[in-house]
Amino acid sequence: QMSYVDHSKSSGPPQPGPMGPMGPRPGEPGASGAMGSRGPSGPPGKNGDDGEPGKPGRPGERGAAGPQGARGHRGFSGLDGAKGDAGPAGPKGESGAPGENGLPGERGRPGPPGPSGARGNDGNTGAAGPPGPTGPAGPPGFPGGAGAKGETGPAGGRGNEGPQGARGEPGNPGPAGPAGPAGSPGTDGAPGAKGSPGAAGLAGAPGFPGARGPAGAQGAVGAPGPKGNNGDPGSSGPKGEPGAKGEPGPAGVQGLPGPSGEEGKRGARGEPGGAGPRGPPGERGAPGARGFPGADGGAGGKGAPGERGAPGALGAQGATGESGSPGAPGAPGSKTGPAGVAGQDGRPGPPGSAGARGQPGVMGFPGPKGPAGESGKPGERGPAGATGPVGAPGKXGDVGAPGPSGVAGPAGEKGEQGPAGPPGFQGLPGPQGTTGETGKPGEQGAPGEGGPPGPAGPRGDRGFPGERGAPGLGGPTGARGAPGPAGNDGAKGEPGAAGAPGGLGAPGMQGMPGERGAAGLPGAKGERGDAGGKGGDGAPGKDGARGXTGALGXPGPPGAQGEKGEGGAVGVAGPTGPRGAPGERGETGPPGPAGFAGPPGADGQPGAKGETGDTGPKGDAGAPGPGGPVGAAGPQGPAGPTGPKGARGGAGPPGATGFPGPAGRVGPPGSAGAAGPPGPVGPVGKDGARGARGETGPAGRPGEAGAAGAPGPSGEKGSPGADGATGSAGLPGPQGLAGQRGLVGLPGQRGERGFSGLPGPSGEPGKQGPSGPVGERGPPGPSGPPGLSGAPGEAGREGSQGHDGAPGRDGSAGPKGDRGESGMAGPPGPPGAPGAPGAVGPSGKSGDRGETGPAGPAGPSGPAGVRGPAGPAGAKGDRGEAGEAGDRGHKGHRGFTGMQGLPGPAGAHGERGPAGASGPAGPRGPAGSNGAPGKDGRNGEMGPAGPPGPPGPAGPPGPPGSGFDFVSQPLQEKAPDPFRGGHYRALRSPDGTQKSPARALLLGGSNDVELRFTYSVSEDGCTTHTGSWGKLPLLDLAPMDVGAPDQEFGVEVGPVCFL
């Protein structure tokens, strides 16, 4: 039924017309309607299936305590508790009864060597040992002193014929000898010079004058005429028979000493003599003259800064001039004038350029020691006074500290044997000590039997002259002999005349530094230096000032597309549009994007256990494993059966040397041995008794010239000659090698302040050095102030369509639907996460035993196993046959001392022994108080000025000093000091405060200025001990002017430690 309502009279908007009649067929389905509102809750559904059991819940909170139960039965005793800590020691119990002696213990290991015992008494002289083998020839000994005059030796054999000597001086006429038998007539000689007429002979019987007949027989010898002049010597006649020995003539008068011979050439340097015994200390020598100034030492390291001095008065500021050119070195100044009153210290000026070192001034004389008190101005030096009389000797000082050990004296005589002490307890044998020093030579053994004659010895030294023989026949003149050995010292000669002035002497040793010279004139401008090396990276600079704003940059490339902007605010709802006509059916839309992966499913049940697989193929042999640890010793195995008797073994190696057996009985005398080699030449026997006087032998021919004799001992020192004229000064010697660094001298007195140098000209600018490396990037600067806002940019282009938005949040869960029918099986899901490991399955059956693999390489040998327990002794084997005799073993070592027996009962007291020898001198007593100072010595004459030393290198400017600074030396400047052990890299320094710093050594000057020198410590190495030695770094201390009764000097060395 339709109804119609007329709304024409309504004044509202037009309403839709009435619905038309139903069309002939149903229309196509319309679009889905909007989701309806939520319906009311349905009735509860059927019970679902039981869920799987949930995880166990957390433990509940602890319940309230229940009421106390009734008392239980007594429990069983508990196990023993752990051992408690040791209690305090109880009181000492009474001594127990002595136990029985225990069994002797095993022999102990040798203990460490004990300290050396005191030296025992010398033993009795042993019996003479058998003669040792001939030793090698020793080195030639030192020349011995002259021996006693020997007996006259027998005449020597005739020497070789010497060359014809020069004609000798005419000899004194000898006594006429007895007439010899007539010789056979010689050939006629050349006619001699006419002799002076002889005495008239007896008149002969007048003969008949006839022709000259042959020479008649020789007539009787006439009386000898007077001596003619000496003819030239004839050739030597045959040797006559020896005449009877004449009586010795009386000793001639000692001749006057001959003139002094020319000085011989310097002999070859002798072998160094053995060290003589230490002589007694000589008397103290006179003080030496002061030496020349030493070369400058190298610059010392920077000293520790001194305490800050009081500020000085402000000096006037000078204008900084340019550096002046160097002045020539000034001439040495004359005597130092009196020092002015010291002004207050000005502030340190800027360091000037180093001037050349001035020549050392002439050395002033040391002033006499003034009384203590404030230092007055030194007065001018007075002239030297005359030498005063020698003062009376001072009191003897107390005994000084013990001197160094002297050389060991000769062994004293053997004292009498003292009474035997009680036996000591047995010590364990010590390990073998080091080889002892060679023992003293024993006393001379009994002489052996005479050996066969030795080979001929070398030619002996020339013997001393025998007693004067009777004059022999005149021999031919020999050649001039070599100079004989030097004679004994002659008597002390008279002082010689004054010598001529000496030549230039060698330059003397460098002396002590002179006083500080006056400041030199400024030095010349130096040459331009080379460009310096590249400097190290500088420290980052401070932040620079803010830079000016830069120019506007070009526009950059367009940026990447920005993310989709957030949605705008919801616009105002528009008016509802008219309902459109139904559209055509749209095409099926594309499938939606895949959803996000769901969470992983729960772990699946573990799968059933698979069957055992087939045995795999045999693997390769593995690499040898490392050696296993040493296994524990296995249990002792049972004794094996006794083996059969072995074959006779070969002779074993010689066994270790056994302990020496007891001495055997004396054997029968052996058969005579073969003659030994000739023994060495025996010592010279004692002088025999003097033989009967022999007959005078014939004069031998002159012997060969003897070797030059050894120089005789030097004669006594002659009295000094008169002083020679002073030689002119020598040229300066070449510069010597740089000496080892000298010790730091005591600081000199402060010199007067020098005048300021003229300002030097400014140097040329140096070359530009290479640019340094780029420095490390500095730290970022502070952020600048915010910039001005920029102009607004142009509007951007329309963005492309954004990506799909993230899925919205899950809606609230709908009500539970009915259980659907089972769906088709889905595709297999992704593999689940691995399940929890299943329980361990039962062990599989043992596989077949694999084939033996190839033997692996031998592993490294494991450490030796623990020594197993000794097996039971085997059955005793049959006795072997006797082996062949081995070589005679070496003499066995001395057996160990047997174990100490129990102490015997005390013997009766012996008689009191004789008094022992006086003990060694006691230690030197403490030093006595210093004696009164001696008078001042005379002033020495002024020495000649030394040659100027080479200018030393300019040192680095030192730190401003207050008083004196004691600057430590750099450890390694030139060659290493051989006496410096490991360098003192680390000395332990005691703690100190800023006000009173710790000092390793405190030295004070004579003006009460402390010289401080503290080592810094980089590491305390006292915990390690390297065994190397070191010395304290105190090189030399020369305390001066200590000796008044209230003065003392000492150095206290605290704990030090060397690495």
Swiss-Prot record:
Compositional bias (Basic and acidic residues): 47-61, 876-889
Top-level lineage group: Eukaryota
Residues covered by the Fibrillar collagen NC1 domain: 1026-1059
Stretches with biased composition (Low complexity): 85-104, 116-128, 179-251, 283-293, 307-339, 383-444, 479-498, 572-581, 594-621, 656-675, 695-722, 836-845, 861-875, 914-933
GO cellular component: collagen trimer; extracellular matrix; extracellular space
Composition-biased stretches (Pro residues): 13-27, 130-142, 945-960
Cysteines paired by S-S bonds: none
InterPro entries reported in the protein's UniProt record: Collagen, Collagen_superfamily, Fib_collagen_C
Annotated segments matching region Disordered: 1-997
Name of the protein in question: Collagen, type I, alpha 1b
Species this chain originates from: Epinephelus caninus
Lineage: Eukaryota, Metazoa, Chordata, Craniata, Vertebrata
